[in-house]
Amino acid sequence: MSNAEQQAPVQQDENQLIAERRAKLAEWRKTGKAFPNDFQRENTAAKVLEGYGEKTAEELEGLPIEVKVAGRLMLKRVMGKASFATIQDLSGRIQIYITRDRVGEEVYADFKTWDLGDIIGVTGSLMKTKTGELSIQAAEIRLLTKSLRPLPDKFHGLADQEMKYRQRYVDLIMNEETRFTFRARSAIVASIRNYMTGHGFMEVETPMMHPIPGGASAKPFVTHHNALDMQQFLRIAPELYLKRLVVGGFEKVFEINRNFRNEGLSPRHNPEFTMMEFYEAYANYHTLMDFTEGLLRHAAREALGKEVFVYQGRELDLSKPFHRLTINQAIQRQHPEFSDAELADPEFLKAKIKHFGEPLKPGGLGSLQLQLFEACAEAHCWEPTFIIDYPVEVSPLARASDTNPEITERFELFIVGREIANGFSELNDAEDQAARFQEQMKAKDAGDEEAMYYDADFIRALEYGLPPTGGCGIGIDRLIMLLTDAAAIRDVILFPSMRPE
């Protein structure tokens, strides 16, 4: 039997259930009371359970307490003149006890026709069942919203991973783990924001549409501004605008917002993603490594109450000092047989990149060293590791080292083999920056779609004088993945990019 043949009866059953629910809605409309909006919820499930869950049945009987809760009908057991139901709100679930004698024969008859997924409001007193479960004994119960689509089967509907992404609203209804992930995401972002403002950073908003794409090596999305009759690009990074603000005197700025890169989908990549970038005058890359390390620990501790996690079955400890290695040191940690001389030999590097099965990209010595690191060492940076001192060739916006002009004062932070942050001492020499932009334009002319454009206005800003500055970008989505044990980036983005159905 084909997959389509297996799905056909399921689809027919669903269509029949939807038709039955629509018929119920039509009858409800006739009463003139469909979709009321006058029910005032006063309690959440969690607050009721927290406040009264430990009280005995006798104690509850002596309390003249009335509660008003509302939520989605998730379970329902009709037993003659009495029934049990469970409703779910954002805070959790609570059981409702409904009797015909208490709510009235007409309301009880209506209740028996309600479907799982309907949203209801309940007013009543508190009681304990024979099994000791805190429940609400309904004095009044109302249908607030009719659900026209049946909830998926717990064991089949939720097994479809793609359905979770396409219909996140259903996933959130059915899956407590998903709800936890996105509550945790919100808490982590809030803790990051609090840390930044607590350290004197000002939050700003910079343009999402740029006349010139810049701030990162990536392929942009292109659009057209009708009123201005000009081509614009969805931003790939806010970096150049944030540095303009430092030129203007805002010495500590940050932004948490979306970036857009017209590139592929993978477990680690989504074309639309969330980044935080921050810049601090009179700081350097050493300062920012220390700051970033403290920020990540704070976010984990503040939002989730711990610094040691299990990620995909393996322990991840953020409490220990983060490692700091150069690109060559990271390569030699995995392959101590590679000598310093060999890692400075372009032909050796090309051969090893091919040996590890990676396609060779155009570039000079610095690019080849980075390609080899990505091929054989990056995935092994499980513990938090700052890879430092990147070649100038692959760091067009970073300040060159005073001791070695071939490398820059740049770091990337890797955790569980994934890049989480990228930062550097900013290049504040306008003439050097202009020359590097020219080199990037040559690379673009040679076919490198990710090479940067020449941004004349940014050069003009630098000519007014950018103080010594450190800057860093942190991938919020990848950080959330680590802290919530999510295997794919789409698990931590509410509505990820998807191919058409």
Swiss-Prot record:
GO molecular function: ATP binding; lysine-tRNA ligase activity; magnesium ion binding; tRNA binding
GO CC annotation: cytosol
CDD domains, per the entry: LysRS_core (cd00775), LysRS_N (cd04322)
Obligatory cofactor(s): Mg(2+)
EC number: 6.1.1.6
Cofactor binding notes: Binds 3 Mg(2+) ions per subunit.
Keywords for the protein's UniProt record, in alphabetical order: Aminoacyl-tRNA synthetase, ATP-binding, Cytoplasm, Ligase, Magnesium, Metal-binding, Nucleotide-binding, Protein biosynthesis
Catalyzed reactions per annotation: tRNA(Lys) + L-lysine + ATP = L-lysyl-tRNA(Lys) + AMP + diphosphate
Signal peptide: none
Residues given in the record as Mg(2+) 1 binding sites: 412, 419
HAMAP family listed in its UniProt record: Lys_tRNA_synth_class2
Record protein name field: Lysine--tRNA ligase
Annotated organism of origin: Dechloromonas aromatica (strain RCB)
Lineage: Bacteria, Pseudomonadati, Pseudomonadota, Betaproteobacteria, Rhodocyclales
Gene designation: lysS
